[in-house]
Amino acid sequence: MEGYIKSDIKDGVGTITFFHPQSNSMPGNLLRQLAAEIAKLGDTIEVKVIVLKSEGEKSFCAGASFDELIAINDLETGKHFFSGFAMVINAMRLAPKFIIARVQGKAVGGGVGIASSADYTFAVKNASIKLSELAVGIGPFVVGPAVERKVGTAAFCQLTINATEWQSADWAKEKGLYADTFETIAEMDVAIDILSKKLASSNPEAMIMLKQVMWKGTEHWDSLLLERAAMSGALVLSDFTKNAINAFKQKA
């Protein structure tokens, strides 16, 4: 079964759902579809707020697709793949609507980047996070600016350097990544429903201005994240990285 992106609109709330059978890991085509869907709902007048979620209960997003990573054989293909996450982050940044992320399970790599790029992120208590890129021979170059903006430089460095260790949802809340955490998915969904309805009836012009203020200083990310994608694209070509990814896959 292939992955998919779907969306629906109800009472001013646009909900985008993504899915991939491999723990919601994201191949390049899904990343581009997700970025396009975020941009589309951002431009849809009847949408006042966006909720971003994934299917299942164990994993919010496992980051990049290892199958695609291993298949990368040239720099341009590598840059193209990693620019997918850049497109998603920039779409979230530029959408003139607040984006609420629903993190119902663990987040790895690019998944942490997506959670960090939302304007308000809810999570359950078992939604641990990990930036595992260094463990497979690359680095969190593309998602780094979004994660660092949310949790600060010290916490970002901790996640990046200690690439094999999970950090708890409580840690992520303490650092500012998660706005609130819940024991169950059902409790989280109630809170998301309450906030999204409040925002759907709030002043759209005020929210547009607030979003611009909140993201001030990121205007250069269109070019920055593509430069970062090229860095990851170059590293993924090395024998070290290919061997590390293969070893990681065999453990999984």
Task: Describe the residue ranges of each PLM region.
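Glycine- (often His-adjacent) and acidic-residue-rich active-site loop
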Residues: 54-88
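Catalytic-core regions built around general acid/base machinery
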Residues: 37, 84-96
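A general structural signal for well-ordered alpha-helical segments in protein cores
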Residues: 31, 66, 144, 153-157, ...
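Intrinsically disordered, low-complexity segments enriched in small/flexible residues
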Residues: 227-231, 235, 247
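Crotonase-fold acyl-CoA enzyme core
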Residues: 91-109, 114-203
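Terminal peptide-recognition signature
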Residues: 16, 33-34, 52, 65, ...
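Conserved CoA-thioester-binding segment of acyl-CoA-metabolizing enzymes
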Residues: 1-53, 90
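Amphipathic alpha-helical segments at domain termini/boundaries
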Residues: 1-17, 160, 164-199, 207-219, ...
